[in-house]
A protein has these predicted regions:
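Loop-centered beta-sheet repeat module
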Residues: 167-185, 191
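Extracellular glycan-targeting catalytic surfaces
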Residues: 1-163, 175, 179, 199-202, ...
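Long, repeat-rich segments with strong aromatic
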Residues: 186-214
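Hydrophobic/aromatic side-chain positions at a characteristic register within alpha-helices
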Residues: 79-82, 185-189
């Protein structure tokens, strides 16, 4: 697998160059990231044993949503500013999730949680894979965590879609699970999983298939 994920080194170098030159609109856009509460070196995440979405009175999925956002933004600042303190904090936050979270649960909405946050955690981890301070055993644990916690739910939704008609769910449900499969496949070096996502995008039976999802844009 090619390990550039969502962003390439050329992307990051272009951002660094625009930032160094103080060019607009790039510098103002970057300032929004700098000012984000989630991108700070001190930003902590609060993992839960179960990510719950669609559980009346007991939902906590925003912990995962914020957690993935924090790690992603910290990873972005590390790649752009090349300050290892951002990467160290991002890895600390990811390790907390790996050590704490064992699954995703809820009603049918658990499939949104698995797709959205599985994708977001995976792309954040991919950004950090080359950080020398991420112990290789911890990185392997992160890879296994994605495969255990998110991938089964992604796969089940795209195959079974909660025992409904294949076209029952709007495209966003399917597309986030496709994106999660592709991102997880890349960061875990599982081309078979990546190919599953591509195959569903091209020929799947749900509204995540491009020929069906495009009409909803």
């Amino acid at each position: 697998m090619l390990h550039e994920g969502l962003h390439t080194e050329e992307d990051f170098q272009r951002i660094r160059d625009k930032k160094a030159a103080g060019e607009e609109p790039w510098i103002s856009a970057y300032q929004l990231l700098v000012e984000s509460q989630f991108s700070q070196k001190t930003a902590d995440t609060y993992p839960t044993e179960w990510i719950k979405r669609g559980v009346s009175g007991d939902e906590n999925y925003m912990n995962a949503a914020r957690g993935a956002t924090i790690v992603y933004q910290q990873a972005l600042r590390w790649k752009i500013e090349q300050d290892d303190e951002y990467a160290a904090k991002a890895v600390e936050n990811l390790n907390k999730w790996v050590q704490t979270c064992v699954g995703v649960t809820g009603n049918t909405n658990l499939s949104l949680a698995a797709g959205l946050y599985g994708y977001e955690f995976a792309i954040a981890g991919e950004l950090l894979r080359d950080y020398g301070g991420w112990d290789r055993a911890d990185f392997a644990a992160f890879q296994n965590w994605l495969l255990k916690v998110f991938y089964p739910a992604n796969d089940d939704f795209l195959k079974r879609h909660h025992d409904t008609n294949a076209l029952h769910y709007w495209a966003n449900w399917c597309l986030c699970n496709i994106a999660a499969k592709m991102a997880i496949g890349i960061v875990t070096d599982r081309r078979d999983i990546y190919n599953e996502g591509i195959a569903h995008l091209q020929t799947g039976d749900t509204n995540g298939r491009l020929r069906l999802s495009l009409i909803h844009i």
